[in-house]
Amino acid sequence: DWLEARGHATTQVGLKRSNLASEELERAKNGNILNRTTLSLFYATDFADQLENTIIPSLRAGFVVLADRYIYTLMARDLVRGLDEEWVRNLYSIALRPDAVFYLKLSPEKLIQRNFMKNHTLDYWESGMDLGLSMDMFDSFVQYQQRLADQFEMMRKNFDFTIVDADQSVDELNNELRSHTERVIH
């Protein structure tokens, strides 16, 4: 809304939003039986469909594309799950390099609080339960999210992430993101 009020047409993309794969991916995840490679390929298909049918056409039409998570989240998840780094990079080599990446950094402990406030439960996959880190979903969530944070820390150097402290009010966070976004757009 903020960008559109400033005259920029926008399109939003994110995980599990493609017409081709999102519903099947959600159904497959509900059974908690996917192996790491199949899960990765499902998400890669979801991304590729959005790239071809939403991202590229929107950019060609002059839109600003806003991605709520992009390939870096998918790559980090795959790497934490033990997939080969070269394979993962090749899988997502079709992706366009974004003009900016804002990494909203929050400790796993704070993240779990926000997750409970929003969803009132923990998700099997977001908790890394498939990795066998702990039989306790809470402990597994914290360990898995810490591994993701460590992976993002390693990736940010290669992909030039702008780190944003997510442990602030919604208004403060929005103001900071707007400030960073203005620098990119102008």
Where are the model-predicted features located?
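NTP-dependent small-molecule kinase module
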Residues: 2, 116-186
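Conserved nucleotide-binding/hydrolysis micro-motifs of P-loop NTPases
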Residues: 17-19, 71-72, 106-112, 170
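Structural signal for short hydrophobic segments within the conserved structured cores
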Residues: 11, 100, 162-164
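A glycine- and Lys/Arg-enriched "phosphate-lid" helix/loop adjacent to the NTP-binding pocket
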Residues: 74-147
